[in-house]
Amino acid sequence: MHKLFILTGPTASGKSEVSKIVAERLGCTIINCDSKQIYQHVPTITDQAEYLRTSPQFRLYGYVHPSNSYSVGLWLEDAKREILLAWEKKSPTIVVGGSGLYISSLIYGLSEIPPADAHIRQKARALLSEVGNDTFFELLLRRDANVCKIDRRNSNQLLRAFEVFESTGVSIFSWRERCPKKRPFENCEVCVLFPPKEELHPKINSRLVDMINSSAVAEVEYLMSLNLPADAPIMKAIGVREVIEYLRGNISLPEAVEAAQRNTRQYAKRQYTWLRRQLPQDAQFLPTREEMVQHLVSRLTETEK
């Protein structure tokens, strides 16, 4: 039976660099599991190094146009296809990224909930944009008391709950009970690059400075030219929001950098918590890139024997 390796960890921990070294040593296939690195035309703001976008060993990087509607369900289907193709070629395979919802879907599966019609999705987005998260949350709560389980700051979850109820008349939580999740792959091994926070923060800060000094501002100008809705996933990416505020004249460029650094550190803090609580008990946590490279090379070599 094939074993699927998943490499995750907080933002800026060095997952991509580890995957590059392992791919070069073993010739394995790397499949993206970062919900922002799927997008085309914005490599700097999403930290897509050139090798991620150009090497045939690296899959599902920079392949979705920012204006396209995309979801975790679509990503899971794309990822399953790429994994099975790699296994057909007898290529060792690692799924790499830090997006919790994507990782969870790959490990635990998704409930089979009917998709919403396009006009309902548009209605949900328009309402959220008009009234804001708090009022939108309260409107949902009147329909379904279980909505209290949703973080009102999470626009994607609020929108999905609205869409499901509007489309089917049934709560998304009821659908999840009716349609239990089915694991896409039974044999997964999760490896977590987990550096100490005090080591991660300087890397986050320097990475944001490098992004701004490169082409991040031009990329955000391009996104703004597309007239995407404010709640489009790429428009909510850390770095994008702050640069938009700068381009609109609301803050200075140094203030935008500071805000992006602060928001990225807060995001990393949430990732640390999620990684400790939501992964399988046998997930392997390692603090350094060197240890993770050694571990993955060893485990992949053993598995291929």
UniProtKB/Swiss-Prot annotation:
Signal peptide bounds: none
Q: Provide the residue span(s) of the region labelled Interaction with substrate tRNA.
A: 34-37
Sites binding substrate sit at: T11, A12, S13, G14, K15, S16
| Subunit description | Monomer.
GO MF annotation terms: ATP binding; tRNA dimethylallyltransferase activity
Which residues bear the site annotation Interaction with substrate tRNA?
Answer: S99, R121
UniProt-recorded name of the protein: tRNA dimethylallyltransferase
Q: Which Gene3D superfamilies match?
A: 1.10.20.140, P-loop containing nucleotide triphosphate hydrolases (3.40.50.300)
Tell me one Pfam family matched here. IPPT
**Physiological role:** Catalyzes the transfer of a dimethylallyl group onto the adenine at position 37 in tRNAs that read codons beginning with uridine, leading to the formation of N6-(dimethylallyl)adenosine (i(6)A).
What family is reported?
Belongs to the IPP transferase family.
Required co-factor(s) are: Mg(2+)
The positions annotated for binding ATP are: G9, P10, T11, A12, S13, G14, K15, S16
